[in-house]
Amino acid sequence: MKKRLSWLSFLLLLAAFTNIQCAKHALPPTAVSMPVIQGAVCVGCDRCADCHEEACNAFAKTIHGRIAPFETAGLGTGCETCHGGGSLHVESEDPGDIITFAKLTAAQQSRICLDCHTRFHWAGSEHYLNDVSCLQCHKIHPPVGNKLLAKSEPDGCYSCHMDIQAKAQYPSHHPIREGKMGCSDCHDPHGSMVGSLLKTDERLNDLCLNCHASKQGPFVFEHAPVLEDCTICHAPHGTIANNLLKQNEPFICLQCHEFHFHSAKVGYDQSTDGDSPSTYYVPGAYPEAHNLSQRSSFKRAWTTKCTQCHFKIHGSDLPSQAVPGQGKALTR
C-alpha cells in the first residue's frame, strides 16, 4: 500500500511539474484571441479596389491572388480572407472597422496565416516562442520572389541571425555564400519536431548523413561520436579549423583521447624513445626525448595531426595494422 502511495505521489508531482513547464510557453496559434469586427460582412475585392487599386492589382499577381475558392476549404479568397468582412470599412473608411495587420501581435498575424497553412509545426517552434510572425519573412501584397520572401536566402535569415552570418565567413564553411545551398536545406523556419528548427524528426546525424552518406556506415570499427552526434566534433555554420572542426588537430582529439606512442610522447614521457611502431622500442632513436626543455620534441608533438594515421576517423571495416591489439584505431 505504501509503495502504491509513493508511486502515486511521484506521478502527481510529475504532472504538476509538466503543467508548470507548459504554462511558461505561449498559447498555441489556435488558442490566440483574435479581434472581431462586429456587424461586418464581406463585400468582395472589387469594392476594396475602389480605394486600394494599386495594392489590389499587385495582389492579383501573387499566388494568393490566383487561389481558386475550392482550395481554401470555405475560408474564401481575396482581401477579406485575411482582413475580415469589409462592409463597415467601406461605409466609414475608418481603419478601425477592419482588421489591420499593423495593429496585431505577432501571434495574431501568424494565426490568420495558419488558417490556411496548416501543415506546419509552428506552435512551440523557436520562431513562434520568440514572437516572430510570418510577415517578418514574407510579403503578402507585392508579387515578390520565391515563396513571397521579403529577402532571399540567406539574407533574410541573416537579418536576425547575425552571429551565424559571421560564422559563414570563416575559412571552413558550408557553401552558402557560394550559392550552392541555403539555410532551408537544414532548417525548417516554420517549425520542426526537434530543436533548432532542424529538418529531421529523429537523430541530428540523420540530417547530416543526407549529404554525407559515405560517413554513415555501419562499420565494423565505429567511432562513437559519429553514432551519437556530429556536432561533438563539427560546428556546421563555420569554423577556422578545416572540415568544420571545432578545434584544430590534435587538440580536438585530445578532448577525449590522451596522446600515445606518436611524437607527442617524445617530449612528454621519458620511457618513450620513439614516435612510431618501428622506433617505439629503439633506444636512442630520439636522444632529445629525455630533455623536456627541447623545443623540437614538442614541435613534433603539436604539429602532428591524428588523421595522418587515423584517417578513417568516421569508421572502418578493416582492422588496423602495426598496432598490436588495437583493431579499432581507424587507420585504414
PLM regions and their residue ranges:
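Short sequence/structural segments immediately N-terminal
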Residues: 4-5, 19-332
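Bacterial N-terminal signal peptides
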Residues: 9-19
